[in-house]
């Protein structure tokens, strides 16, 4: 009788451990990388924009220190540039060439790396020519920045 109880208890623990092992990897698989979270923010910017063309990530500032909790809002700073793709095409911005003399916007705010939670708090302001002592020249998909920085 004692052996049956021990066996039943062991079976329950084994089942719990198996379920835990199945749940933990799927939770971590839902976390985005810092860059993916920023690209999601750019997509949201394009969805909410009333401008004619899509914007694409031009420059991503350094990510913050590593934080194990994907649900914690992380500060973010990045630059986007107008592309040649019209917004209604719904083409991925990464496949669009930058528009010559297109608008450039500096964006700051917070993102989370959790795919389930989706709080984004991003504000973008248009930049005029020089940013932080640097001037960037962009041709199609490539940009060269000169100056300090």
Swiss-Prot record:
Give the span(s) annotated as Disordered: 61-80
- Keyword Metal-binding assigned: no
Q: List the disulfide bonds.
A: 85-96, 107-124, 136-145, 138-143
**Where in the cell?**
Secreted
| Annotated Gene3D superfamilies | 3.10.450.10
Please classify the protein's predominant subcellular localization into one broad category: secreted
Q: Which UniProt keywords apply?
A: Amidation, Antibiotic, Antimicrobial, Disulfide bond, Secreted, Signal
- Where in the sequence is Arginine amide found? 148
Q: What does this protein do?
A: Microbicidal activity. Active against E.coli, Listeria monocytogenes and C.albicans, in vitro.
Q: Which family does it belong to?
A: Belongs to the cathelicidin family.
PANTHER family, from UniProt? CATHELICIDIN (PTHR10206), CATHELICIDIN ANTIMICROBIAL PEPTIDE (PTHR10206:SF2)
Protein name in UniProt:
Protegrin-1
């Amino acid at each position: 009788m004692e052996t049956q109880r021990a066996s039943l208890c062991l079976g329950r623990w084994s089942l719990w451990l198996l379920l835990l092992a199945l749940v933990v990897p799927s939770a971590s698989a839902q976390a985005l990388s810092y860059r993916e979270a920023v690209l999601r923010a750019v997509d949201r910017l394009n969805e909410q924009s009333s401008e004619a063309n899509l914007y694409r990530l031009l420059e991503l500032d350094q990510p913050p220190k590593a934080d194990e909790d994907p649900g914690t809002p992380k500060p973010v700073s990045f630059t986007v540039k107008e592309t040649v793709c019209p917004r209604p095409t719904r083409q991925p911005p990464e496949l669009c060439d930058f528009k010559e003399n297109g608008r450039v916007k500096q964006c700051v705010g917070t993102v989370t790396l959790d795919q389930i939670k989706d709080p984004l708090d991003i504000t973008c302001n248009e930049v005029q020519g020089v940013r932080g002592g640097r001037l960037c020249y962009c041709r199609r998909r490539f940009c060269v920045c000169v100056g300090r920085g």
